[in-house]
């Protein structure tokens, strides 16, 4: 039933916007990447090869990934075909956008000032936050019966009361790493080249809290629900992180077009449905 309702909403959205784009002319977009897209009748989108469920390699039917679904909707909106190009690093995304190998990137990509010097970011289509998976061993025992305690652990900020017990693992040079360095500079912070190594250090009891963005934590729990027995997810917002599309620099026509599209996805509830399908359910997990 949930899947049917989602498909119906998508169909209504596409039908609503399909007709006007038959009226577009390339001359309206002279000098913009949109002119090239309409000329070749194809939208080329870079996606993050290593970040499920934004992109899922060899996916289950009906679950290609959040970013692939958004890209397909945008291609339909423009009235062109879609080509997906899986890439790995921000450098690859920015260079391929600049050279024209891809038109834009939808890659579960968070914005920051340094990245903004190399690409133009769209309005965010998702919002995340630094989040954690903390060992229950260092938390106070659960209240019994009708006992009510004032301390609840909902976000990374709540760990400040356990400073002597907390140590962190995190992927190096990320917004999450920077957040920890500012918030918990006096506590042990171990940074690693990948999230998987950082998770392994939590599971090996080398640290007591793994830190990543909230979507990564939710994905980890969808794939490994048994983790909830020994670890508590801390998903409350401590700092907004914007997930945005990356586009060519100074292409205001292209950015304005995509921003309007994203606003309509938000207004019609399509993005809420996508977030629920991939981060609150595990039907996509292989």
Language-model-derived ranges and their functions:
Residues 49, 126-134, 139-141, 214-262, ...:
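Periplasmic-binding protein-like
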Residues 68, 72-76, 91, 95, ...:
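Solvent-exposed, polar/charged alpha-helical surfaces in well-ordered, non-transmembrane soluble domains
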Residues 2-13:
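Bacterial N-terminal signal peptides that target proteins for export
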Residues 27-109, 113, 117, 191:
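Extracytoplasmic small-molecule ligand-binding "clamshell" domains
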Residues 91, 109-118, 179-182, 199-239:
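A ligand-binding cleft/hinge motif common to bilobed small-molecule-binding domains
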Residues 27-31, 68-77, 136-157, 165-167, ...:
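Extended ligand-binding regions for polar small-molecule ligands
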Residues 46-51, 86-90, 104-112, 135-136, ...:
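Beta->alpha turn/N-cap motifs
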């Amino acid at each position: 039933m949930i899947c049917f309702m989602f498909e119906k909403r998508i169909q209504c959205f596409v039908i609503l916007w399909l007709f006007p784009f038959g009226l577009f002319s390339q001359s309206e977009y002279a000098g913009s990447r949109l002119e090239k897209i309409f000329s070749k009748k194809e939208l080329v989108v870079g996606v993050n090869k290593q970040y499920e469920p934004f992109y899922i390699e060899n996916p289950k039917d009906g679950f290609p990934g959040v970013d692939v679904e958004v890209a397909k909707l945008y291609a339909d909106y423009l009235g062109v075909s879609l080509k997906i190009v899986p890439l790995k690093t921000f450098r690859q995304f920015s260079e391929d956008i600049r050279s024209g190998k891809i038109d834009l990137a939808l890659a579960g990509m968070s914005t920051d000032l340094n990245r903004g010097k190399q690409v133009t970011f769209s309005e965010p289509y998702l919002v995340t936050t630094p989040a954690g998976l903390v060992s229950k061993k260092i938390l106070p025992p659960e209240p019994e019966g009708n006992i009510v305690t004032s301390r609840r652990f909902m976000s990374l900020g709540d760990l400040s009361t356990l400073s002597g017990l907390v140590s962190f693992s995190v992927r190096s040079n990320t917004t999450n790493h920077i957040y920890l360095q500012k918030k918990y500079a006096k506590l042990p912070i171990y940074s690693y080249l990948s999230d998987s190594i950082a998770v392994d250090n939590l599971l090996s009891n080398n640290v007591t809290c793994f830190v990543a963005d909230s979507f990564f934590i939710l994905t980890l729990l969808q794939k490994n629900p048994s983790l909830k027995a020994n670890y508590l997810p801390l998903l409350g917002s401590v700092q907004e992180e914007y997930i945005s599309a990356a586009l060519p620099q100074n292409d205001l026509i292209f950015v304005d077009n995509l921003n309007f599209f994203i606003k309509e996805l938000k207004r019609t509830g399509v993005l809420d449905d996508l977030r629920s399908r991939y981060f609150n359910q595990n039907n996509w997990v292989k």
